[in-house]
Design a protein with these regions (language model features):
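Short alpha-helical DNA-recognition segment
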Residues: 48-71
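DNA major-groove recognition helix of helix-turn-helix/homeodomain DNA-binding modules
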Residues: 80-98
Length: 100
């Protein structure tokens, strides 16, 4: 039986090899979320970036537990606004309103 990587693993590997692409990826995922409101896709993308940046490092910087971050960004996650904001700050971003 062959072992295959999941798409999430493939994305994470890509960003490990191309960290310079993360900024544009974050911009795109929030643009897409603004258009379609697909929270699961947004959380999955943030989960990928968080894995690349390091869940432990993010936990230390945010004061959230590793488990709390993983739960917030899980497929069934329903994170608090403060959690998403803290995670974004830890990976070098901020939420900023923009007129539609």
């Amino acid at each position: 039986m062959r072992n295959y990587r999941t798409f999430d693993e493939f994305k994470a590997d890509y960003f490990y090899e191309h960290p310079e692409e993360i900024d544009e990826f974050i911009t795109i995922i929030f643009e897409e979320y603004a258009k379609d409101g697909d929270i699961k896709a947004l959380l999955a993308s943030l989960r990928t970036v968080s894995r690349v940046k390091g869940i432990t490092a993010i936990a230390e910087e945010t004061g959230l537990s590793r488990n709390g971050i993983q739960k917030a960004l899980s497929e069934n996650g329903n994170p608090y606004f403060e959690s998403i904001n803290a995670i974004l700050h830890a990976i070098g971003f901020r939420l900023m309103p923009q007129r539609i």
